[in-house]
């Protein structure tokens, strides 16, 4: 099932999910895979940001392909845009490893619009900052749109210790360019922990995103 992807030789998938992490987050992988496989029949690609051999073997057994990002200049979550730019799929959906898949998510590929990043609005951040934010825990796209390459370049040229990939993307866009480059996905594809715990969200949930340290505590309780 598994291939190790290199730049020179890769199979192109019509539709694929992709996730990735390093050794500090690998404890969630078995939990993530179990939930994902219950609710998706699509190929899953794993981006190795620097996991242990044990974790890598688990992902080799459960994924269609492995992307090796252990020897790149970006650190941590700044490897996400590089992964997305190089992911070998016509239609790609990135999903964070702290996302709990609770229902069939394969329909997300039918919602993707070309030339855009397809994301769920970050309702908690939007509510608390007064600006429109989108959460990068789930990001879909067709081919490799210009905005994805711009995001990747921005991460390479202006990362800061205080920011993550989501913050870099937000800093690139104004209200007008957001309309051009971001397509809103239904909230159910990325429901954030704060929505459920403090903001009274009562809608459908296909993907529950357990953000922050409190979210990781919730995940540990499920293991």
Language-model segment annotations:
Residues 31, 35, 58, 83, ...:
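Amphipathic alpha-helical segments that form well-ordered structural scaffolds
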Residues 133-134, 203:
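Short, solvent-exposed loop/turn segments at the edges of secondary structure
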């Amino acid at each position: 099932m598994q291939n190790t992807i290199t730049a020179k030789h890769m199979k192109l998938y019509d539709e694929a999910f992709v996730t990735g992490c390093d050794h500090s987050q690998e404890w969630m992988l078995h939990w993530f895979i179990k939930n994902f496989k219950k609710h998706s029949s699509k190929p899953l690609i794993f981006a190795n940001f620097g996991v242990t051999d044990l974790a890598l073997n688990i992902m080799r057994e459960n994924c269609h392909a492995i992307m090796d990002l252990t020897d790149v200049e970006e650190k941590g979550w700044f490897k996400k845009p590089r992964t997305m730019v190089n992911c070998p799929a016509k239609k790609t959906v990135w999903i964070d490893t702290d996302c709990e898949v609770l229902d069939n998510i394969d329909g997300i590929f039918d919602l993707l619009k070309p030339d855009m990043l397809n994301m769920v609005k970050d309702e908690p951040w939007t509510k608390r900052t007064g600006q429109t934010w989108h959460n990068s825990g789930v990001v879909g796209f067709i081919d490799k749109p210009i905005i994805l390459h711009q995001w990747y370049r921005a991460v390479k040229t202006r990362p800061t210790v205080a920011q993550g990939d989501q913050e870099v993307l937000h800093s690139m866009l104004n209200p007008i360019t957001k309309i051009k480059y971001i397509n809103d996905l239904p909230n159910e594809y990325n429901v954030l922990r704060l929505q459920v715990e403090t903001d009274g969200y009562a809608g459908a949930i296909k993907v529950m995103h357990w953000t922050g340290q409190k979210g990781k505590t919730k995940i540990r309780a499920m293991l």
